[in-house]
Structure formats: C-alpha cells, structure tokens
C-alpha cells in the first residue's frame, strides 16, 4: 500500500510538468504562421525569388544580423541595432514584433548606445498576439533552413 501511495503521489506531481512541456512542444504551428504571415505580406516577401518590398525579404531571417539584407534601405535605428549586435532568433523576433520601435530603442540602450536609440524603424505594424508570434516564427523558420 505504501508503494502505491508513493507512486500515485509521484504521478500527481509529474502530471502538470508533462502537460506543460508537451504543450510547449506544440506551441508553434507553421501552417497557422503562414496564415499570420499574410498580414506581413503588405510589406514583406518570403520564399523562392522573394525580393525586398516596403520591408526586407524574410528568407534566412533566423540567425541574420539586423539591418543587413542587401539592397534594402533600413532606418538608422535598425542599422544601429544590427551594428550593436542584434541577431534575429526566436527570442528577439518574439520580443520585436509587438512593438518594433520600443524593442530596438531598448536594445540599443541595453548595449550602452543610448545616443543611437532614437528615431524609428520603418515597421509600423505590431503583432501583439503571443500565439500568432509563435506561429509566424515557426513559419519563418521554414525559410531559414540552416538554423
């Protein structure tokens, strides 16, 4: 009886952990992200043959230094962030999308470059939904095969 009780207690303690970690494994949905990216297509392109538009093309975004897509005229704020070491990864994209200007300004201040933390990025769109951000990142990862 004592053994069953200990096993039962262990199972009860483990259940929330399993539920949380299995949810994280499925938290990103690239198919849903493709639908979310349609909002981004007002300015951005992705996929074979994508070219810069109002915003830079998004191929190979994961792992790229900010402000470095050839042929795109970035804002000084965006270029300064890249020069200060901003690399696009899941975490930085997730933090950037709800408020691009605030993210870049804070990034530069944290890097000790408050004199460069002025102006604005060209990206006026804000993606505030956490799930949509996770999903669009999963979609972007499909076009960053080396990452």
Question: Where would I find each of the regions flagged by the language model?
Answer:
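Electrostatic cytochrome c docking/interface patches
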Residues: 20-37, 47-49, 147
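Bacterial N-terminal signal peptides
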Residues: 8-21
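Short cysteine clusters
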Residues: 40-43
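Short, exposed beta-strand-loop hairpins at the edges of beta-sheets
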Residues: 125-143
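Extracytoplasmic electron-transfer domains, predominantly the class I c-type cytochrome c fold
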Residues: 35, 52-123, 136
């Amino acid at each position: 009886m004592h053994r069953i009780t200990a096993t039962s207690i262990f199972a009860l303690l483990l259940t929330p952990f399993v539920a949380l970690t299995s949810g994280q494994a499925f938290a990103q949905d690239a198919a849903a992200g493709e639908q979310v990216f349609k909002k981004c297509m007002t300015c951005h392109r992705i996929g074979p043959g994508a070219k810069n538009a109002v915003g830079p093309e998004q191929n190979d975004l994961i792992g790229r230094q900010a402000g470095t897509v050839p042929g795109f005229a970035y804002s000084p704020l965006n270029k300064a962030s890249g020069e200060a070491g901003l690399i696009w990864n899941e975490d930085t994209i997730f933090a950037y999308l709800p408020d691009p200007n605030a993210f870049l300004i804070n990034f530069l201040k944290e890097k000790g470059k408050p004199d460069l933390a002025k102006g604005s990025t060209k990206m006026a769109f804000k993606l505030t939904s956490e799930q949509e951000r996770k999903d669009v990142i999963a979609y972007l990862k499909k076009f960053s095969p080396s990452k």
